[in-house]
Amino acid sequence: MSAREVAVLLLWLSCYGSALWRYSTNSPNYRIFSTRSTIKLEYEGTLFTEWSVPETCFVLNKSSPTTELRCSSPGVHAIKPIVTGPDEEERYLFVESSHTCFLWYYRVRHFFNNFTQLITVWAYDPESADPDELLGNAEEPSINSIVLSTQMATLGQKPVIHTVLKRKVYSSNEKMRRGTWRIVVPMTKDDALKEIRGNQVTFQDCFIADFLILLTFPLLTIPEIPGYLPISSPRGSQLMASWDACVVASAVLVTDMETFHTTDSFKSWTRIRVPPDILSDDERRSVAHVILSRDGIVFLINGVLYIKSFRGFIRLGGIVNLPDGGITGISSRKWCWVNYLLKAKGRRSTFAVWTENEIYLGSILLKFARLVTTTELKNILSLSVTATLTIDRVEYTGHPLEIAVFLNYCTVCNVTKKIFLVIYNEDTKQWVSQDFTLDAPIDSVTMPHFTFSALPGLLLWNKHSIYYCYHNFTFTGILQTPAGHGNLSMLSNDSIIHEVFIDYYGDILVKMENNVIFYSKINTRDAVKLHLWTNYTTRAFIFLSTSGQTYFLYALDDGTIQIQDYPLHLEAQSIAFTTKDKCPYMAFHNNVAHVFYFLDKGEALTVWTQIVYPENTGLYVIVESYGPKILQESHEISFEAAFGYCTKTLTLTFYQNVDYERISDYFETQDKHTGLVLVQFRPSEYSKACPIAQKVFQIAVGCDDKKFIAIKGFSKKGCHHHDFSYVIEKSYLRHQPSKNLRVRYIWGEYGCPLRLDFTEKFQPVVQLFDDNGYVKDVEANFIVWEIHGRDDYSFNNTMAQSGCLHEAQTWKSMIELNKHLPLEEVWGPENYKHCFSYAIGKPGDLNQPYEIINSSNGNHIFWPMGHSGMYVFRVKILDPNYSFCNLTAMFAIETFGLIPSPSVYLVASFLFVLMLLFFTILVLSYFRYMRIYRRYIYEPLHKPQRKRKKN
């Protein structure tokens, strides 16, 4: 070999590992990749000669390592750089012919006085936008964007904000201002995922793409404090990170130089610094694990937990019920479930802490409790007392209420150990041992990551290989490579696994320490090597953006970080084209609009899923559920075949068929038939080329705490808002007290009273509401009672008029049966018995008032005619088959009117007595007069005085 050839070889070897090429567009997250897009090509290395592109594509400067590419025709285009040396990888770019050309841009202002957010929206063209718009830094639209938005508005464009979870819609109520629309939405934490949508309006044959955004309460980064010192991982270690499962834009990254905190996917960030007097220099450089929680950033350093928050930097130990040392690991939730059904009191945990022998669960406000010890686990799992059992890992599963515990078990712990798996449910408090056992070297380190699925599924990896368990541990094995083995290090220059990334679509990225990436999908057995995107020496980490796309974060040598969008699906398509991997079906659809459904008594959920596939392949949809067996299913399948393709549609109805009436253990039966069920749809065959692996959603059977009832026509508006007192006459009270009752009318609780003439009958109309507003009128039976004990009212229907065959339940009879209970608990759905059967109850007096009301029986409340009064009623749904919730509401009625005149007979009697008394007095006075007259007729009343003679 000549000296020149040796020099060339050495040059090539020095460049090997750093020579690569990539591409980008002006559209964020590669959302528009079409014939209209400008594709920027970039070669990183020193051996570049020129670009090789097909004839249908045009390169601005073919001999420049950095240039622009446009492809005028859609399809798959082979692009690669020509270099001096071994050929570089050829990519197959899928260029679309799309009429989606424009994007939405938004800015947000927060108003804490009324907890709203003002979203300013405009349309922009990525091919003609200002640099600030492309970088996401623009505060106002550019001239081109103003013109575009104004033109679109003239054609009828008006964006709205759709919330993904609660399906609410917000629109602009203002006129357009300088090419922008302004939309006000409320701040929320449980409906943060939103989408900007526009009308189907075109300009120059182009539409605006819908845009997914994440809006929560404003999040702040922890500020840097002068004089504080950096905290980092050990020198030379790989990057570690943690993020909020429901707000992926909020994340923390630990490098061997600094720790960075962000709330906007690292578009901006702050460095985390700690006081100089708490940790030594070695401790500050010894971060082993990190967790981002709502209370702050939790660091694990030398077996001790520390937390950095806005309040400072403190050590966590005995003050929060945690060990002061010996902690071996911490973990947090990976998947976001905003809604879930938790029957037990309390909160679910947000992260786990463990030592070799103990597990602690933590929730918000740094509340920790010990969950279990290995000694207790030996008893629970019936393991040998003499065997060695230690806690290997604790990981949250894809289920919102379950935690997986990996246990190391051995009797003679010299060479190998067995790894067992048990799952703990935070709601039922039950431990379930799984059909999972793995033999491993005694000193091996394995890392688990559960998938987003209804049935438990996970990936478990060591330095070189990945072990998969899908479909509740029934589909297992080692992830294979095209080389026929499962050792990923052999295909990545002996590098070891650094990160395993899984998204909600089932994509799996295995990143090696040298940035070689392997790609797989859940429910598949193999992985393929993707094109090199980042050079071997750059320290990188893969994150998920708020739009559901992936991006790389690079830690640079100068102590800063940088982000770069990663076109995962374009890269996967390129490899699939090379390997001729095809999805076995053409389309997989469903109408599951939510990820969380509530089913109450008497309700059913009907959904459908459809698969389109080539003839003679026999595909179908698999429906799987996980959780308590509390739901019944009905299936209906329809099939169509045309033009060589088959369409199979499966319609499912989930329901309950339980009668809760006349059962002795009402509450126990309710509890047995409530719970959380996870359901997933997946095709019977699958490959890495398929877009979505499966559809996962929850069905919660039980009481929706956002459901309530109210009485139609009653509100807290339309009256003077004030509390006042009034007196109830003791004779009007049910329990007959010895004195009158003075009560206070609490307006904030009772609302405005309805004023009725006491000649008017009243039938309450009960309405059902949830957090979205009015749902329907309630047709079920309900009862009412006056909360202060008044019983001077009645009902117009008798038991006989209502169709009773025996004596119905009344407040009087129920109080007699349940004297030990307060009034509001003596009668309810748990002890309700109807009166429409001869087999139940006793005949009794059917002329009594019927005290049960519904919307159709015409039963009304009527009032006493002799006096007015204030009545505060509580209404309760009585039907035991209506709801799992104890639905009650309050309303107040004030009666008024003229006191009615007495009857004619009473008046006549009174007048007769009065006349009789008058004539009696008259006669008596007559006889008295005559007696006096007769006595003095001859004798004057006043005798004259005679004068005496003087002697």
UniProtKB/Swiss-Prot annotation:
Q: Where are the transmembrane segments?
A: 904-924
Q: Which residue pairs form cystines in this protein?
A: 57-71, 101-206, 246-336, 410-413, 583-690, 703-885, 719-752, 804-835
Positions in the Cytoplasmic compartment: 925-951
* Compartments, as annotated in UniProt: Cell projection, Cilium, Flagellum membrane
Major location category of this protein: membrane
Spell out which residues lie on the membrane's Extracellular side.
Answer: 20-903
Topology versus the membrane, per the UniProt entry?
A: Single-pass type I membrane protein
Identify the GO cellular component terms for this protein.
Answer: CatSper complex; sperm principal piece
UniProt KW Membrane keyword: yes
Tell me where the signal peptide lies: 1-19
Pfam family, any one: CATSPERE_Ig-like
A GO BP term here is: flagellated sperm motility
Entry keyword set: Cell membrane, Cell projection, Cilium, Disulfide bond, Flagellum, Glycoprotein, Membrane, Signal, Transmembrane, Transmembrane helix
Q: What glycosylation sites does the entry record?
A: 61, 114, 414, 472, 487, 493, 535, 796, 854, 881, 886
The answer to whether the entry has keyword Disulfide bond is: yes
What InterPro entries does the record point to?
A: CATSPERD/E, CATSPERD/E_C, CATSPERE_b-prop, CATSPERE_Ig-like, CATSPERE_NTD1, CATSPERE_NTD2
What family is it from?
Belongs to the CATSPERD family.
What's this protein's function?
A: Auxiliary component of the CatSper complex, a complex involved in sperm cell hyperactivation. Sperm cell hyperactivation is needed for sperm motility which is essential late in the preparation of sperm for fertilization.
Share what the entry says about its subunit structure, partners included.
Component of the CatSper complex or CatSpermasome composed of the core pore-forming members CATSPER1, CATSPER2, CATSPER3 and CATSPER4 as well as auxiliary members CATSPERB, CATSPERG, CATSPERD, CATSPERE, CATSPERZ, C2CD6/CATSPERT, TMEM249, TMEM262 and EFCAB9. HSPA1 may be an additional auxiliary complex member. The core complex members CATSPER1, CATSPER2, CATSPER3 and CATSPER4 form a heterotetrameric channel.
The name this protein carries in UniProt is: Cation channel sperm-associated auxiliary subunit epsilon
The organism of origin for this protein: Homo sapiens (Human)
